Every structure is written in C-alpha cells, then in structure tokens.
C-alpha cells in the first residue's frame, strides 16, 4: 500500500512537471469520454430504461397491416369488443382510452388541460401506484353508468398548477365548469399519453362508440403468437364495420417500446460509433504522447533497472501515471457530457423519445464513464508501459547524454497509430459531409405547399356544445371569418385533418363504373376552399367549391394530380364520381352532412403536395368540404404578413369574441412543425453531431500527427545534424520529414476511403447522400492532407534548423 501511495505521488509530480503534455493528454481523453458518455446517457434513457412500467415490452398497440405493408391502421374498440379481446388466452388485460382537451374554469385565467379518459382497470394494466392518494378504481366508472367526477393529476401538472401542494388530495378542480375531486397524484415518470390529468372513461356497449385500446399480453407469450390468436377476432369485428378496416389486413402488435423508443435506436448507435471513433483517436493520441514522453525518460528508466527495479515495478509506475491522466480525463469528460447533454436533448426530434424517458447523468452512466476510463487506461497505457519497461540498460548507461534516438520499431508503431487516426478522421469527415449534404437536400425539398408565415390554430369543441350539424358548421366558419378579417392576416382556411406535414385519413374508395374488384386507397382530407390559397397549392384543372357548396356540405370532390394520373390514363378525372364508405353520422362526436355517403362528383384537380412527411411518395388524395364530415375538432390555417405566432394573442381575442369559453389547443407554426418531424430532426441531429465530432477528430488527429513528427524530429536530431554536416540542405531535411509523414498519412487515407465505402453500405438509413461521392471524398482528403501538412510544418522547420555542431556534440 505504501509503494502504491509512493507511485501516486510520483505520478502526480511527473504530470505537474509537464503541464503541456498533461493538458493535451487529458483533453484528448476528456473529449472522447465526454462525447461517449453523453451519447450513452441518451441510449440508456431511450433504449435501456424508456418506461417505468413493469412489463413494458408486453404492453402493445393494436394495428393492422394492409396489402402495401403499411401498419398505420389503428383499431378502435367498443366496450363489448374489448370484453371479447380480454377473453383471448394470450391477453392479460385491455385498457380503453380517449384523449381530449379541457379547460380549467376555477382560476382567474383559464388553462388548457390535456386529459386522458381511461378505463378504471388502468392500475393493473400499467402496474404503478399513485405517489399520493390513489389511482382510478372500478367504482369510478361503473359499467353502463356515468363516471364519477374524479381526477388523477400527473406529477408535472401538480407541480405547475398547484405548486406541489401536499394537501391537494380531496380538493376540487373546475374543468369546463364541472367540479372534479382530486383523488391522486402520479409519480414523476408516469406520463402515459403525455397528458396533464387522468379521468375515468365511460365504457359503453354501443358498437358505434369506439376508443383506443392498449393491450397487455401475458408473460411468455410472443407478440406474433398473440397476433395470430387475435387475427380471427379482429376479422369478426371488421365484418361489422368493413369501411373502418383495410382489405386483407394482418394484425400486428408492436410494443410501446418498439413504437416510441426503438425508432431512434439506429441513429443513437450510429452516433455511439462516431464517438467511439473519437475516443479511439484520443486514446491513440495519449499513447503517442506517453511513448514520446517515455523516450525522454529512457535514461531514467535504465537507471531504475540498473539499481534493481523489476519490470513489473516499472510497468506499475507507468500505468499509475496513465491512471492519473485517465482519472482527470473522466472527471473533465463527465463535466463535458453533463454540459453536452443539453445540446443533444435540445436537438432531438420532437416526440422522438417517450415522455417517461429521463435523460440525465445518473449512476449507470457514471459507472459507464468510470469503466470507460479503466478500459482506456489499459488501452492507451499498457502498450507504452510494456515498450518502455525494457530499456537497453548498457547502451543507455554508456551514453553521455540523456537524448536518445528512437528505435525503428517505435517509429513504425507511431506511424501505425497516425494512419489509424487519419483513417478514422477521414471516415468521420466523409460521414459528416454526406449527412450535411443530405440535410441540405431535405431543407430544400419541394413540398408542393408553402409552410412559411403560416400557423395552425386547433379548435376543440366541448362535449354537449354545437351538437347539431348546421350549428357546428356555422360555428367553425364564424371563427375562420373573424380571423381572416384581421389586418395582419393574408388568408385563413379550415382544415379538419389536412394540415401538413402529416395529414389525411387513408381510406379505400369506390369509382363509379369501375369493374376492378380491388379498391384503390386515397387520403381523405376535409377542408374548405380557402385551404388551398393559404398553403399556395395551385388549382391545375377544373374548379373549387364556392362558399354555398361548402356550407351545404355538397358532395363534391377535388383530387390531386397523382390520383388523376393513377386512375385515369389521360389524367383527367373531372366529372367522374367516387364514393367514400367511411362517412357515418355519429352524434355528438361526428356530424355528417346529408348525402355524404352518396356518389361525389370530381370538380377539380390540384397540384400534388407532400402532406405525409418529407420524403414519402405523394399518395392519391381526395379533398371534400369540411362540412361533409365534422368532428368535435377543427383547425384554422392562418397565413400572416408577420411572424405567425406574434399574432396568437390577437387570434385568441377574435375567437373569444365568438365564444368566451372556447379554448385553443397547441398552436403550431407550420415551418417549425416541419423541423420537428422525426425524419428532419434525426437528419439534423446526425449532421450536426457528426460535424462537431469530425472537427474534434480532425483537431485530435492534427495533435497526434504533430506529436509524432515532433517525437521523430527529437529522436533523429543527431541524424539530421550529421546529414547537414555532410552537405544536406534544408530542403533535403524537410523532404525526409514530410516523406515519412506522407507514408503514414497516405496509408491512413487509403484505409479511410475503404472504411467510407463500407460505411456507405451500412448507413443508408441515416445518411441519404452517398459517402462514395468522388467530389466529397476528394474534398475531405484535401482537407485532411492540408491539416496534416500544417501539423507537420513546425516540427519539420525545427528539424531543418538543427545546428550540426550541436547535434554532433550530443552524439
């Protein structure tokens, strides 16, 4: 123990004696450890521990896969259907849910509250207890009866609205002028649905009232086995309401982990590979620095060996110094990771991670960082220690100077490390360039509509208000008209479900006179005539509806060019008739105009627009008047002369003029909405972080190259002096230095190009542009070669300025 303490003190003294060496080594490690720890923090939160619910991988969504392979068809269940599903041998539980926005009416200012109406078997389904009070219980929603007016708060809403009042249980909260008793507060990580409150759901046996199910399969049952058992049950449900189900569907049961956590996994693993490369470059730097530093200490080590120090004793001393560097590096790295986490989280795509996931520097992440430090200590410290612990005692003791020449083996080892650094750096630069090009292409993509200066204002209708079809149609139109009349508003239109970048309701359609058995599918969009003007979607052929046709719910349709080309060879669909079977009147939730289930004549064709993401192929689309099928919700699209959200207060004021109690849900700037999409956000995240990591890698590689060349110059000083004494010129010495470096850099570039080709095959999911682009590879290679030349210039000049007489005296 005493000898270990002595080693630690000696190591600290040695590191303090060389602050430049110590700082460079520590920073090289800290950057790699910090970046790796930050990425691992996100991986741990999103992929390892995304949900606090026991058996989260057994909680599944009920989806249907259509003939095209799309699984974006969701199944709604009535109470009786849920009961049938619970009887399946593979099913442990089924919880029914619905989402709605309410308004608090017990304070000075109303506040929008996101509510999750949930069946009272939720405690068993999610397997979590309330933090305070209780969860919902069966008596809160007796079958066939109206639910009790009770509410359970999320931890976040309790903190925000009630400031964490510990005496909240038993108090009441007014929601849309109805008192609800607060019976519980959930733990901080219980955030299912990302809502504010949980209210008991009224479950009825009415087959027309369907809500979203969450299915929990039994332990030991695979998702495939459960899906196979549920397939005939869901097929029976489909016979009752064929219009709600795609043809020839297959049941799919993705877990909530599959749906909400794992999609980001490949991107995170790609970034982990990038930071691992950065760590390898940093570790190679430290190995180079330790070898160079050790070469200066060969005389000291020879003296130690001569007076009896064993090899293991010297290895332990050298590893202790490496451990000191690693310890300091991990402390600084954790601090860098802590600060860098904010940057990563801020640039994660919106809704790309579960609300329950907590990204922070927790104990597992700290243990990972410590383990990483230990591994890197062995990785970068052991090999130099083994090399330096075998000094040539006789030769070194006979030398009259402490300056020694480096061995050919040491120079080759350094060269191999430099080549590896160059290869990894070129790979990262190429990946960063490809990711950057892909992101720029995405930014400049032609969407077919103009999202700039436009916002979406969601308007929900409270239960038992505007129930009649005519009243609801006039109410929505009145709000739109008041907003459109504002001085700073260019235009306003209504979009029930057609707001890009993700819009439409995928439905099979019938074509009058068609003899084909298979029905084509199209996106059904409910809009008014102003919708196209707001989004700058041009009319290509025919006409749009007039105001009277809109307010009457006249069954007339407008289609996009893709649908016209696919269904009619000459692209002219004007005058043809189509039918949508899914339009059913279900008061008070859905109000449908008379005749909406009849044949609809096509009166116009509009240009294509990407209203389902940014990269997917444009799908057939059918636009019908919003009054044909109205929900308890609509959106007003508003194009403005100024920044859209700057008018939000004035827009709310106009809405209040129509109905003082009308709430407004989350208002979105369409352009910002696009930038929050997963495909946009992931591409931006990869491009940004690869750019940062590649710059750091380039800097570390330059430091490593500088260190190697400096080491080579120091160990070959005598050789250079002799050459110059024999007549060599400055250019000859520079050529010697640069030629040796060129061999290492050239080998690294060749290896880097091969790695880039391999990377191109593996990373097509995240990097849409090819990393084999000759222009990109040439540009990256030139950048790397120029950086290498600059890193070599100073030590090369030092070699060329060696005084021959001084060098000869040292020999």
What are these regions (language model features)?
Residues 18-46, 50, 281-284, 326-331, ...:
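Short, strongly hydrophobic transmembrane alpha-helices
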Residues 39-42, 287, 323-396, 434-437, ...:
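Small-residue-rich transmembrane alpha-helices
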Residues 282-326, 404, 703-742, 802-803, ...:
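Interfacial "coupling" helices/loops that link adjacent transmembrane helices in transporter permeases
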